[in-house]
Amino acid sequence: MLKNGVISDTAKRAIAGMMKLAPSITAFGNMNPTSYLRLVPHQEAPTNVCWGDRNRSVLVRVPLGWASKTDLCKQANPNEQKSAYDTHQKQTVEMRSPDASANVYLLMAGLCVACRHGFSLKDGLAVAEKTYVNVNIHKKENSKILKKLDTLPDSCAASAECLQKQRKVY
């Protein structure tokens, strides 16, 4: 995920795939009608198709906390011994829309397909750049950025339609 302490182009391509397939991924990650009660603007759960690092207003968050040379495990658990592993290469991403109704097997398979799709996109890096957000998109001063972003489906039926439209990728 990281190259010289920054997110790599390979990781950006994987994220681009997640951005492209985010609408249909909700069909696997939000499988009942009540799931969509939390997917409303200005709540903790994301509603817009975007990503960022250390940003809780985005759909795919790259924490980047592991990118530092600090042993975060040791910081969080002071009574533990220092990790013997080089943790700065242990980068993660978070897809923040799924909830407890998710079919974890279909969701993980969908995310894998999305990453693979991102690797094959000719414009993958451009997609990643276009959907990258480094501000809280819910603040009033960032409303122009918010308006440029696609939104996630707002119901099971809308998610199913998105899955139907993108089914060839799967």
Task: Explain the meaning of each model-derived region.
Residues L2-Y170:
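C-terminal accessory/tail domains of diverse enzymes
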